[in-house]
């Protein structure tokens, strides 16, 4: 709960001006206390039994309550300002349907605001709605508008009944309420409460609208309708829950102090989340944290909280064992009490009680130590000692006493004592600082009294628990227990509020597990080494215990020598025996050690890389000797005497050792012929395998390896081992691997894991090709399990995304696919341009990276590999891991959003994007059937670039298959089956598995190879849709590309011939490039100048794919670096050293590995920034080169752009730019324009089209030609624009003015000169003599032979590539000369003579034919006359004609 202590506000008494109402009533309603009591009983129902607590919060008050009756208008509303909370109630007396009023409450904030809209449907299950959304809410609404349409990104959109149980009879006894804070909103609705945590700014302004009845007349007769209780301040109520009865009453005495210091212990011993932790401090044995957050083990699990108003004069005793918990406030636990905390709230400056104030600590062994402080430094005045609580009136000097003798000076008491905490292990804390440490403590007693001052005590019996603690000014302000799955994530992320997203799941601590040991079978001999330490103790002049340096150490005798003892057996066990004798003032130690002189001998680590108490923990050596002399020793142990007040080093025990496996320290005797190996298979076990220690799961594999005894990864982790007796290979995998938990609104809704077992309390699961997904979403059994995620598709909107993974609010898992679009048809231009005289058609290859593979790193897993002690040390680095993980996650999310917005696929275009569709003649229109398809001689080379449908990989071209087959990854974990395969544990892990084991998880990206292929295929299909106006599948791809070629101004008289030449050259170029892709990869690591664009593109692909894998491999290898620690294995360090010494060594590993992680993150973020720019370039290339024809020279290939095609490539796209490269140029003298004069008038003519150039030819005539191709022609008047004059105006400016005119102007010469002047040396060159010259002979014969071998190999490769280069160079296309110059010339004389003869001959012939033929001609008339003379006239017989009607 957010605010356990309820605040009640006292309002001013005058509100008439703020309530524009028809009628305002300010009076006490009859059932107001019943409403408040019911509200508080409901609120405190979560309190455990046996609770007596004061609640303080912004809760409803007894008065004032306001009733506002308004007229029937929506235009007016009531506004209140500076509110902290608001409560309202609906009266039910004498109310009919017409009497009912609706209400709209608006709480204004930024960026979120709140609206609560109530209708007149009192008996409905959805009669009202609450909205917490971004936006500007309306002040009024309509009865039917139960929606949150006014806002966006709603935190709460919930409909609820107005009356409990949907019955109007239940109305009137429940309050509605709203509380708003900077990080939380609390809503009380229909008896239920809602708490929504988010950051927001609130103005405190509340608006009431729509407070009206059905009619004005009815409204005027009402008295009790909506009643409002605005809250401005804190109020207090006392809730007593005893014997099953809860009593609510007003709090009148020490309410604020009670709220600040007393809480009700929650079930499980938890302190309420809204407790203020007044005067609670973070206990520390070292430096004190001023402000910040950290995860630590602190005594914050409360077994019993005892509120004590005051103490009696007599002394009180508090024991750790058998403490009576009869007066506890709230829940009671029976855990072992670790720390008793005394907390005091004081209201005056000095709170010292009457009489002596002494803390008595009853330590084990019956020795009682007393702690007290004095106003003077002389401890003889101990009888006047005291420990005052509160602000002291001067310095107080504190001592530890025994039987009236000051044993130790502790220091000066803090100026203000607010808390004293004492642990059963002998630590005495004041305000959180470890003031004193002694032997374990049984009981505490003191006679501290509070006198007559206003003091309030609490005594808390607490146990240690892990928690996320927020500290401000050295005091605890907030605690989050690491006691649940979601809280564990909060602790690992060091934040109390989790934003929506994916978070690595912190590995669970491994409890007591079985011990597995693997050793070589052998005949073992065993030696027991008994070391006896005799301590000598005496008192100083002031009575303090002192350990004498005359204390002796006795080793077993060996070869008549007791100074050195060497292990000569295979195994050994070391045991220490300690004795203690005391003396008075001499050095004769005969008496037994009693009281404060009692001491125990301990052997500390000293300078050795292993601890003495870990020698019997299967540590192995080649040689091991103990010595009392430093001669020949490698290191030493410190032998100390531990008393109740301190530790004193008395002697040193020296060690002579060599690392190896011949000697093993064991806990017990195992002599004889044995295979001492003990294996616990298929369960988490603490192992020691041939000296390699750690925690993991051992599984038997089917692998057979001839060589090796054990096998490690590049990071040094143990991956497997061999049983030398039977040759069986066993794998070693971590007990748990990293998982990614999906958190939405502070709740875990799902988790990504490689293990098919329940985790985080999630039971429902589905599987993907890459991992398992567990969720709160119920994947029902009727869906197919163990198959692709498509079988479990859920129609929902993902709230959080990572890579191509999305999770909805209900926990359902979805894949984020490429955006699908219908695609706008972009028609291709059909204009004509001229062609060069000679040029080369070239297909140039360019690779551009589009995306990177997202990587998730579990920082704690990488740094600590699951070691619980290391994880605790890691929390001292505050937000280091959180920063690393969030940087990778945010970078991946940003890139995924950009890539997702870039990739879209047109379904229509995708259907055309295949060789099969383009080659199909069945779908072609008749007008195009005469065109050859791709399989013919038209553009056969396109078949290598265009995608092809197949059963395995759809939409892939031949070149794409070559690219994905030839590019070899190194060190990068794939996302196919590796993640799940690695955790199977039935094979020895490879590098990829080692990465997963160390928390490095490679996730599938938004854009993978198949999606990129679909995208590029859709681009190819889009070209077809746009060809010649575009007609579905009616146009083959060759025609679409040919339309692009036509645009290059091929003249009509040689069009067919030139097209055939271009097609042949293109086919030859593409064919050779395809071959080179298959062969040039072998020459990338050599120095080859052949096939420059192909080699460069493929090399870049190889580099892009491997650069991340190499970075991950380097990051994994860093785990093998010990960073100046004694070992790179954390488990090995803790196995060899005591905890304190091991912490220091592990701290070095943590620092080094965090540095390696920071370097990797910096490299990744830098790489992502580069890829972001590269991705934008790829988008520009797609739009300008693929979807259209570029006019820029050099952007789409190095030449005049014809067309481009894109293919998918690893992590990006590869472009094939078809360009024209001119090989011959015509040099002309260009003219900017013509200056003409006509008498006194002068004007200029300039060329209208900037793409044309005016020049004078050799015949001294002017022509125009395009700048891109030499095509001279005679100019026309339409080519020019007239200007007024021919004068050229210049702007006069100094050099210093140029940057203001040309911002990017830099005078290079001046800049270089300035640099040389600034760095001119001010020294003179010394004169060196070469009288003596020492030369060193360097034998490089082997290196030269190796270079010659590589050179020969390179030569053979380049010979093969030279053939391909020649083939590509043979694509030179010599087109016909298309340049024409229009001129007028005179015909020679013989031409005119020939014309005259033709005319003389033809004219008489034409006249004769015309006059002599036809009916009117001479010949025709003569024939007619002859015919009439020689023959008689005859008449034909005619039949009678009838009239015929034609219908």
Swiss-Prot record:
Gene3D superfamilies: 1.20.5.300, 2.60.40.3130. GO terms for cellular component: host cell endoplasmic reticulum-Golgi intermediate compartment membrane; membrane; viral envelope; virion membrane. Residues 1102-1146, 1336-1378 form a coiled coil. Residues 775-1447 are annotated as: S2. Residues 1-28 form the signal peptide. Residues 1035-1154 are annotated as: Heptad repeat 1 (HR1). InterPro entries: ALPHA_CORONA_SPIKE, CoV_S1_C, S2_sf_CoV, Spike_S1_CoV, Spike_S2_CoV, Spike_S2_CoV_C, Spike_S2_CoV_HR1, Spike_S2_CoV_HR2. Residues 655-799 are annotated as: Interaction with host ANPEP. It comes from the Viruses. Residues 1020-1041 are annotated as: Fusion peptide. It is found in: Virion membrane; Host endoplasmic reticulum-Golgi intermediate compartment membrane. S1 region attaches the virion to the cell membrane by interacting with host ANPEP/aminopeptidase N, initiating the infection. Binding to the receptor probably induces conformational changes in the S glycoprotein unmasking the fusion peptide of S2 region and activating membranes fusion. S2 region belongs to the class I viral fusion protein. Under the current model, the protein has at least 3 conformational states: pre-fusion native state, pre-hairpin intermediate state, and post-fusion hairpin state. This is Spike glycoprotein. It comes from Porcine transmissible gastroenteritis coronavirus (strain Purdue) (TGEV).
């Amino acid at each position: 709960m957010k605010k356990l202590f309820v605040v009640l506000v006292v309002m001013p008494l005058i509100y008439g001006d703020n309530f524009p109402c028809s009628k305002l009533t300010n009076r006490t309603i009859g059932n107001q206390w019943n409403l408040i009591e019911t509200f508080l009983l409901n609120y405190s129902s979560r309190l455990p039994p046996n609770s007596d607590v004061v609640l303080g919060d912004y809760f409803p008050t007894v008065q004032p309550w306001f009733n506002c009756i308004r007229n029937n208008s929506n235009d007016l509303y009531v506004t209140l300002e500076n509110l902290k909370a608001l409560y309202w109630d609906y009266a039910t007396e004498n109310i009919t349907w017409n009497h009912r009023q609706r209400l709209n409450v608006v709480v204004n904030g930024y960026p979120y605001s709140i609206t609560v809209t109530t209708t007149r449907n009192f008996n409905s299950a959805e009669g009202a709605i609450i909205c917490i959304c971004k936006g500007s809410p309306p002040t009024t609404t309509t009865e039917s508008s139960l929606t949150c349409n006014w806002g966006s990104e709603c935190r709460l959109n919930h409909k609820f009944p107005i009356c409990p149980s949907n019955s109007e009879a239940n109305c009137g006894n429940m309050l509605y309420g709203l509380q708003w804070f900077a990080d939380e909103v609390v809503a009380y609705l229909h008896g239920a409460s809602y708490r929504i945590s988010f950051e927001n700014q609130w103005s405190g302004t509340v608006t009431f609208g729509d407070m009206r009845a059905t009619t004005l007349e009815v409204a005027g007769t009402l008295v009790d309708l909506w009643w409002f209780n605005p809250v401005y301040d804190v109020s207090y109520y006392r809730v007593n829950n005893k014997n099953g009865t809860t009593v609510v009453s007003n709090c009148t005495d020490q309410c604020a102090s009670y709220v600040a210091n007393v809480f009700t212990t929650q079930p499980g011993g938890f302190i309420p989340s809204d407790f203020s932790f007044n005067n609670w401090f973070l206990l520390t044995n070292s430096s004190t944290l001023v402000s910040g957050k950290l995860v630590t083990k602190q005594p914050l699990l409360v077994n019993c909280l005892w509120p004590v108003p005051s103490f009696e004069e007599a002394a009180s005793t508090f024991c750790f064992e058998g403490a009576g918990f009869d007066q506890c406030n709230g829940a009671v636990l029976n855990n072992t009490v670790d720390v008793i905390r005394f907390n005091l709230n004081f209201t005056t400056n000095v709170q010292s009680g009457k009489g002596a104030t002494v803390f008595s600590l009853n330590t084990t062994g019956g020795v009682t130590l007393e702690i007290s402080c004095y106003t003077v430094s002389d401890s003889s005045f101990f009888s006047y000692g005291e420990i005052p609580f509160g602000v002291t009136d001067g310095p107080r000097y504190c001592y530890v006493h025994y039987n009236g003798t000051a044993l130790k000076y502790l220091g000066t008491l803090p100026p203000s004592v607010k808390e004293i905490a004492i642990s059963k292990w002998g630590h005495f804390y004041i305000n959180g600082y470890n003031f004193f440490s002694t032997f374990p403590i049984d009981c505490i007693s003191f006679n501290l009294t509070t006198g007559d001052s206003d003091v309030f005590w609490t005594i808390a019996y607490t146990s240690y628990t892990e928690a996320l603690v927020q500290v401000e000014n050295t005091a605890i302000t907030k605690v989050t227990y690491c006691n649940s799955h979601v809280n564990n994530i909060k602790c690992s992320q060091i934040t109390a509020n989790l934003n929506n997203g994916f978070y690595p799941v912190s590995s669970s601590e491994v409890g007591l597990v079985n011990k597995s040991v693997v050793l070589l079978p052998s005949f073992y001999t065993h030696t027991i080494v008994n070391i006896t330490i005799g301590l000598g103790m005496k008192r100083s002049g002031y009575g303090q215990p002192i350990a004498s340096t005359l204390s002796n150490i006795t080793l077993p005798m060996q070869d008549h020598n007791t100074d050195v003892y060497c292990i000569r057996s295979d195994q050994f066990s070391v045991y220490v025996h300690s004795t203690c004798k005391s003396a008075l003032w001499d050095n004769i130690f005969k008496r037994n050690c009693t009281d404060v002189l009692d001491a125990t001998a301990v052997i500390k680590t000293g300078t050795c890389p292993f601890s003495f108490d870990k020698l019997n923990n299967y540590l192995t050596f080649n040689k091991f000797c103990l010595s009392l002399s430093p001669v020949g020793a490698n290191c030493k142990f410190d032998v100390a005497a531990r008393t109740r007040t301190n530790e004193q080093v008395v002697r040193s025990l020296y060690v002579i050792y060599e690392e190896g496996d011949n000697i093993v320290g064991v806990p017990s005797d195992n002599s004889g012929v044995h295979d001492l190996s003990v294996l616990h298979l298929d369960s988490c076990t603490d192992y020691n395998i041939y000296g390699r220690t750690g925690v993991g799961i051992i599984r038997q594999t089917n692998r057979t390896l001839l060589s090796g005894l054990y096998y490690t990864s590049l990071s040094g982790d143990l991956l497997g081992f061999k049983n030398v007796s039977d040759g069986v290979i066993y794998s070693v995998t971590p007990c748990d691997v990293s998982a990614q938990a999906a958190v939405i609104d502070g709740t875990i809704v799902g988790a990504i894991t490689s293990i098919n077992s329940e985790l985080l309390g999630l039971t429902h699961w589905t599987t993907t090709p890459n991992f398992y997904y567990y969720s709160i979403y119920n994947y029902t059994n009727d869906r197919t399990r163990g198959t692709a995620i498509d079988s479990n598709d859920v129609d929902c909107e993902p709230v959080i995304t990572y890579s191509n993974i999305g999770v909805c609010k209900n926990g359902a898992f979805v894949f984020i696919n490429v955006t699908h679009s219908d695609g706008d048809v972009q028609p291709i231009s059909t204009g004509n341009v001229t062609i060069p005289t000679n040029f080369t058609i070239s297909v140039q290859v360019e690779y551009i990276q589009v995306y990177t593979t997202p990587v998730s790193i579990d920082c704690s897993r990488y740094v600590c590999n699951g070691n619980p002690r290391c994880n605790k040390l890691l929390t001292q680095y505050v937000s280091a891991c959180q920063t690393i993980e969030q940087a990778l996650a945010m970078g991946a999310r940003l890139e995924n959003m950009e890539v997702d917005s870039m990739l879209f696929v047109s379904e229509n275009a995708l259907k055309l994007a295949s060789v099969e569709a383009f080659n199909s003649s069945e779908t072609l229109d008749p007008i195009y059937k005469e065109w050859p398809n791709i399989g013919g001689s038209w553009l056969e080379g396109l078949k290598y670039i265009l995608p092809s449908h197949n059963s395995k990989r759809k939409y892939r071209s031949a070149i794409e298959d070559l690219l994905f087959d030839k590019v070899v990854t190194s060190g990068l974990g794939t996302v196919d089956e590796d993640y799940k395969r690695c955790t199977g544990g039935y094979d020895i892990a490879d590098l990829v598995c080692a990465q997963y084991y160390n928390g490095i998880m490679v996730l599938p990206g938004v854009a993978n190879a198949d999606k990129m292929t679909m995208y590029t295929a859709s681009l190819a299909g889009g070209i077809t849709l746009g060809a010649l106006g575009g007609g579905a599948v009616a146009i083959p791809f060759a025609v679409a590309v040919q339309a692009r070629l036509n645009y290059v101004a091929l003249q009509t008289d040689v069009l067919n011939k030139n097209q055939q030449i271009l097609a042949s050259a293109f086919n030859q170029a593409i064919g050779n490039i395809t071959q080179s892709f298959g062969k040039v990869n072998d020459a990338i690591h050599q120095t080859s100048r052949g096939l420059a664009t192909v080699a460069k593109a493929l090399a870049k692909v190889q580099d892009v794919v491997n650069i991340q894998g190499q970075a991950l491999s380097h990051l994994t290898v860093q785990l093998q670096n010990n960073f100046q620690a004694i070992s790179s294995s954390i488990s090995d360090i803790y196995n060899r050293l005591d905890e304190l010494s091991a912490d220091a060594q592990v701290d070095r590993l943590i620092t080094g590995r965090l540095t390696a992680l920071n370097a990797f993150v910096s490299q990744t973020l830098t790489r992502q920034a580069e890829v972001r720019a590269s991705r934008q370039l790829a988008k520009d290339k797609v739009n300008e080169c693929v979807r259209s024809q570029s006019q820029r020279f050099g952007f789409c290939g190095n030449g005049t752009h014809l067309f481009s095609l894109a293919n998918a490539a690893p992590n990006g796209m590869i472009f094939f730019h078809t360009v024209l490269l001119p090989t011959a140029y015509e040099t002309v003298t260009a003219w900017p324009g013509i200056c003409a004069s006509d008498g006194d008038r002068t004007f200029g003519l300039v060329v209208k089209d900037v793409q044309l150039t005016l020049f004078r030819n050799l015949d001294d005539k002017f022509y125009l030609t395009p700048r891109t191709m030499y095509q001279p022609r005679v100019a026309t008047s339409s080519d020019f624009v007239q200007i007024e004059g021919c004068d050229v105006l210049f702007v006069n400016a100094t050099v210093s003015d140029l940057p203001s005119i040309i911002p990017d102007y830099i005078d290079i010469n001046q800049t270089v000169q300035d640099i040389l002047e600034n760095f001119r040396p001010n020294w003179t060159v010394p004169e060196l003599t070469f009288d003596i010259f020492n030369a060193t002979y360097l034998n490089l014969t082997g290196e030269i032979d190796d270079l010659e071998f590589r050179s020969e190999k390179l030569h053979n490769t380049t010979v093969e590539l030279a053939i391909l280069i020649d083939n590509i160079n043979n694509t030179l296309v010599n087109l016909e000369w298309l340049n024409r110059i229009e001129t007028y010339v005179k015909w020679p004389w013989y031409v005119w003579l020939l014309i005259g003869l033709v005319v003389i001959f033809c004219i008489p012939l034409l006249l004769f034919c015309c006059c002599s033929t036809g009916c009117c001609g001479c010949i025709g008339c003569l024939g007619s006359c002859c015919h009439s003379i020689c023959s008689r006239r005859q008449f034909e017989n005619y039949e009678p004609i009838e009239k015929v009607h034609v219908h």
